[in-house]
A protein has these predicted regions:
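Generic beta-sheet signal
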Residues: 31-33, 100
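Short, flexible active-site loop motifs that bind/organize anionic cofactors or intermediates
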Residues: 6-7, 31, 59, 152
Length: 166
């Protein structure tokens, strides 16, 4: 099951209904597959670059889904950080990911180590990395005096946990 972020748009949105044939063709050709290029993917990349991609970020990489986006982002960060540290003579460092508790980033490879599964039986026998996990400074609404004091306290706690982890 997926679509947590996009389900709010829904299947009955007028754009979806008006473009169902085009969207069906896109689904059949999977335009986000970066190994097989289609005219639809080329159109998408051109539109995304024109509308949403700033000039100072000249490259783009598309994957199918949030979990794989996080996974590929982590691999990119590991690669960059380790190379950066090697070039500075600091050795092969850069494979730790500091992250918040109570989070969900998916259930594939690296993301399992970042996700709190509500049912531990789903992932209990999967190998995971023991990466530093800190308290999230989550806001509670309405943002009244008590809730504001609580978020300030949680932010301080989170910063202290980050400092201790580093």
């Amino acid at each position: 099951f997926s679509m947590f972020a996009s389900l709010s748009i829904g299947y009955n949105h007028p754009y979806v209904l008006e473009n169902k044939d085009r969207l069906t063709a896109a689904a059949i050709n999977k335009p986000t597959n970066s190994d097989i290029y289609s005219p639809m993917m080329a159109e998408f990349v051109e539109t995304m670059g024109r509308v949403a991609q700033p000039d100072y970020l000249p490259y783009s990489f598309y994957v199918s889904g949030g979990t794989l986006a996080v996974e590929n982002g982590l691999k990119t960060a590991f690669d960059w950080k380790v190379r950066h540290n090697l070039a500075k003579g600091k050795g092969e460092k850069g494979s730790q990911v500091l992250h918040f508790k109570q989070c969900f980033h998916g259930r594939s490879g690296y993301t399992l180590s970042l996700t709190d599964s509500p049912d531990p039986r789903k992932v209990q026998y999967f190998p995971k990395f023991n990466w530093p996990r800190v308290t999230p400074p989550s806001m509670t609404f309405p943002l009244n005096e008590n809730n504001l004091a609580n978020i300030i306290s949680l932010e301080e706690q989170s910063l202290n946990e980050i400092k201790n982890a580093i």
